[in-house]
Amino acid sequence: MKKNKIISEVICILMILALLCGCQDSKKYPTEGKESPSQTEEQVLWPSYEQANVLSDGSLALVDLTHKDDGYICARLLQEVTGIKLQIQKDDKKYNYDLKTTDFSTFPVNMENGTYTIKILQQIEGTRYAICASTSMEVNLTNDLAPYLYPNQIVDYTIDSYVYKKSFELVKEDRDDLTRIAHLFKYVVDTLDYDDQKAKDVSETFVLPDIDGSLKSHKGICFDYAASLAALCRIQGIPAKVIVGWTDIEYHAWVEIYLKDKGWINPKIYFKKEKWNLVDPTFSDSKNSDYEGKYDEVYHY
């Protein structure tokens, strides 16, 4: 059958990348998936905005902290204004996000349990920002995987998104998560071509991924590839991280995926004929498809 041929091509042989994982004999990777029920549309997780616990400066922005223990917080502008950021900090790790709209956007609470500091920042000049409002919050996640199961500002989709409908279409006959991941990965690689012009245009600025736009135009950069694959997986109830960091070649984005009963695949994987490798749909679809160098993680989304 065509389906079996596809799966045999992408998961037929197991290979551990000892250089990256440092535990050649202790880590075994799955060669076939354990049967699991299909995700239903009713099971897809969506953020909500009760505003039972908020941070606000009263005029520029509002942050809804209600669902911090579910792995996310939400924020929006209170007026049309530029230069406003949300900062999420734990210990010495900081995530800074631009607030762009008066509609709520979702942001992951993904630095494990503990004390977080949340700030609303306003640009003064250049990279100088003033603190408009600040609070601390204690986080005790109900599910360690939760931050990677919801849409957020980076992995952005709704029930009306093209990627949402496509995710269910691609896996409707699959019986296990490993097969689902294989089909979702193959779709991203087969659908998207690397957009060199966009890469040049955004080389000096941060641009959010455009998942639906990329899938419909069949073009994107690494951020679009990674966010698209993560969205496809999350919609199916498969936790997936978009990771941004350094490779030997460039500053880059890739994906890490969670498998039930196996945990986070480490080293991160992508499906490639006759081996496990990093889940890097951009490199798999480019002249760097054989890249096996370093991946230094900086941010998880």
Where are the language model's segments positioned?
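N-terminal accessory/pre-domain segments preceding catalytic cores
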Residues: 2-176, 264-265, 297-301
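Aromatic side chains
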Residues: 116, 129, 148, 185-187, ...
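Hydrophobic/aromatic-rich core segments of domains that either
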Residues: 224-301
